[in-house]
């Protein structure tokens, strides 16, 4: 009886174990199904967000043509002097661009941020061109960026004076002549001549109240006098106009310059007769360089997504510089961050917890975006490293890395195509967008481009160029060239000092 009971107990235990094993297997299978279901749901949500992003940021060619037309309309409003024009089309008073014949010693001062550059160039005319050039970069102490006008310009003039003192035998100023300077000043000014301009407001971290409303040429001139420096400021220009001048000196077919860097702008050569707001005698050259300030362009045709609208709303200048916020290096990385944040919140892209670093505005910079976008390794190693360092996610799957790279591609492509639409608009304004009606040969047309975004973000620049070719068509695009004018604004200012020299007619 005892043996039978023991056997019975063993059978019951074995049965219980068997049931437990079966139940455990079922539970594991159910848990696995739940995990697989959750993963499938996450993938579905990720795909849905990406589909919405692709749609919101899409730029079909027909839309780009409409944007170009809207750009031309705004340019014409600006040239008429319409007070409500979004694209201001500022008259620069630069009516003579360098020809290559310029000779002599000229200086340039390039002030546009926390550093400034002083440069000198010896020009040798058509044959020798740039004989010699030297430059020096100087950091501006932070306290001078918020001090007084006199303190800032005295510091700049002192550095310029020291630079002049190092002028060697390679540089020659003809007897009895005054040194001349081109002043690149990349802040908003209201110009009344080639060598005068009133500061409208400071940007880029400067806040010097007593300089606002003052003529910056006069302020610099007085500072140079205090240093005992005998130098005439022959030209006041912004960086885009300087790039145009440098581009024209290198290639006589350059008609426009585009800056695509932290910010964006365009300048081009307009027929003076096509500027209704121009008053007084027309320039002898018949031309006038226009500083478009196209970053402020906006139109209901621009594809603004929820990410763009939120970024604009939270910016220091809501409702302003809309075009710039869509295409310039200051903002592209931030747009990518906002899209990744939505994927993290709505689709758990980085897991159940949203990375806290991803919540920080502008933590993802455009150079980091570019590095991820250009990662061609089989495991997208650079993307993984950037997500670890910037977003704080130590281990990311290949799928997450691919999605991140794809978001970079979407944002960069939209920016490049919108930039191409703007360039196409400038070409339309110049009548360089179609073959001549009389059947003559299309003139060679060169666009000088500068800025870190265009120079270093290769997928951006190649997309811009292919989009411009698409907009122009094969016949016209074969005569239109985009050319990198690396660091053209500094030497461009010196060249404009030469072309607007008080001794130009004597030479």
UniProtKB/Swiss-Prot annotation:
Effect of changing residue 186 to A: reported as: Abolishes glucose phosphorylation activity
Where along the chain is D-glucose bound? 203-204, 238-239, 265, 293, 324
Q: Which subcellular locations apply to this protein?
A: Plastid, Chloroplast outer membrane
PROSITE patterns (alphabetical): HEXOKINASE_1, HEXOKINASE_2
Q: What induces it?
A: By glucose or fructose treatment in leaves.
Knockout phenotype, as recorded, reads: Male sterility of pollen grains due to impaired synthesis and utilization of starch in pollen grains.
Keywords from the UniProt entry: ATP-binding, Chloroplast, Glycolysis, Kinase, Membrane, Nucleotide-binding, Plastid, Plastid outer membrane, Transferase, Transmembrane, Transmembrane helix
Q: Does the keyword RNA-binding apply?
A: no
> Which segments carry the region annotation Hexokinase large subdomain?
238-487
Task: State which residue ranges cross the membrane.
Answer: 4-24
- Coiled-coil-forming residues are none
Q: What class of enzyme is it?
A: transferase
Cysteines joined through disulfide linkages: none
**Any single biological process term in GO:** glucose 6-phosphate metabolic process
Report the GO terms under cellular component: chloroplast outer membrane; cytosol; mitochondrion
- The residues that hold ADP are 113-115, 262, 452
Tissues in which the protein is found = Expressed in roots, leaves, flowers, immature seeds, endosperm and seed coat.
Entry GO MF terms: ATP binding; D-glucose binding; fructokinase activity; glucokinase activity
Region ranges (Hexokinase small subdomain): 99-237
Give the highest taxon in the source lineage: Eukaryota
Q: Annotated pathway, please?
A: Carbohydrate metabolism; hexose metabolism; Carbohydrate degradation; glycolysis; D-glyceraldehyde 3-phosphate and glycerone phosphate from D-glucose: step 1/4
Annotated membrane topology is:
Single-pass membrane protein
The family annotation for this protein states: Belongs to the hexokinase family.
- Role, per record: Fructose and glucose phosphorylating enzyme. Functions as a glucose sensor for plant growth and photosynthesis. Is essential for pollen development, germination, and tube growth. Its activity is necessary for the starch utilization pathway during pollen germination and tube growth, as well as for starch biosynthesis during pollen maturation.
Supply any other comment. Plants over-expressing HXK5 exhibit hypersensitive plant growth retardation and enhanced repression of the photosynthetic gene RbcS in response to glucose treatment.
- The name this protein carries in UniProt is Hexokinase-5
Task: Specify the species.
Answer: Oryza sativa subsp. japonica
Q: Which gene encodes it?
A: HXK5
């Amino acid at each position: 009886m005892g043996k039978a009971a023991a056997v019975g107990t063993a059978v019951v235990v074995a049965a219980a174990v068997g049931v437990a094993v079966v139940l455990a297997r079922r539970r594991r299978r159910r848990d696995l199904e739940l995990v697989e279901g959750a993963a499938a749901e996450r993938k579905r949500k990720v795909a849905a967000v990406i589909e919405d992003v692709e749609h919101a940021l899409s730029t079909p060619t027909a839309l780009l043509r409409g944007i170009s037309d809207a750009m031309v309309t705004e340019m014409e409003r600006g040239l008429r002097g319409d007070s409500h024009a979004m694209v201001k089309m500022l008259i620069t008073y630069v009516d003579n661009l360098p020809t290559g014949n310029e000779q002599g010693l000229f200086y340039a001062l390039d002030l546009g941020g926390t550093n400034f550059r002083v440069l000198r160039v010896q020009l040798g005319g058509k044959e020798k061109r740039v004989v010699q050039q030297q430059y020096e970069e100087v950091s501006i102490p932070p306290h001078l960026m918020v001090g007084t006008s006199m303190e800032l310009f005295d510091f700049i003039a002192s550095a310029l004076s020291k630079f002049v003192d190092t002028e060697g035998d390679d540089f020659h100023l003809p007897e009895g002549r005054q040194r001349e300077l081109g002043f690149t000043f990349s802040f908003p000014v209201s110009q009344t001549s080639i060598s005068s301009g009133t500061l409208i407001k400071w940007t880029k971290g400067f806040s010097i109240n007593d300089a606002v409303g003052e003529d910056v040429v006069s302020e610099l001139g007085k500072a140079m006098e205090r240093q005992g420096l005998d130098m005439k400021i022959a030209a006041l220009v912004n960086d885009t106009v300087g790039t145009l001048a440098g581009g024209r000196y290198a290639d006589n077919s350059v008609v426009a310059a585009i800056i695509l860097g932290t910010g964006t702008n365009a300048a081009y050569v307009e027929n003076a007769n096509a500027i209704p707001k121009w008053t007084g005698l027309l320039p002898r050259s018949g031309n006038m360089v226009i500083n478009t300030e196209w970053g402020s362009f906006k139109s209901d045709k621009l594809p603004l997504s929820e990410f763009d609208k939120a970024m604009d709303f939270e910016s220091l200048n809501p409702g302003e510089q809309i075009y710039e916020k869509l295409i310039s290096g200051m903002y592209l990385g931030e747009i990518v961050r906002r899209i990744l944040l939505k994927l993290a919140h709505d689709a758990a892209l980085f897991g159940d917890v949203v990375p806290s670093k991803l919540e920080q505005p502008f933590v993802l910079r455009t150079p980091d975006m570019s590095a991820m976008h250009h990662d061609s390794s089989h495991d997208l190693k650079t993307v993984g490293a950037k997500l670890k360092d910037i977003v704080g996610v130590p281990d990311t799957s290949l799928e997450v890395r691919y999605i991140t790279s794809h978001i970079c591609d979407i944002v960069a492509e939209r920016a490049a195509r919108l930039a191409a639409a703007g360039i196409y608009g400038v070409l339309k304004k110049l009548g360089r967008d179609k073959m001549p009606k009389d059947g003559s040969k299309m003139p060679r047309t060169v666009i000088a481009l500068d800025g870190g975004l265009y120079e270093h973000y290769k997928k951006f620049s190649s997309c811009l160029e292919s989009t411009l070719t698409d907009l122009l068509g094969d016949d016209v695009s074969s005569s239109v060239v985009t050319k990198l004018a690396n660091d053209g604004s500094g030497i461009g200012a010196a060249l404009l000092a030469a072309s607007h020299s008080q001794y130009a007619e004597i030479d």
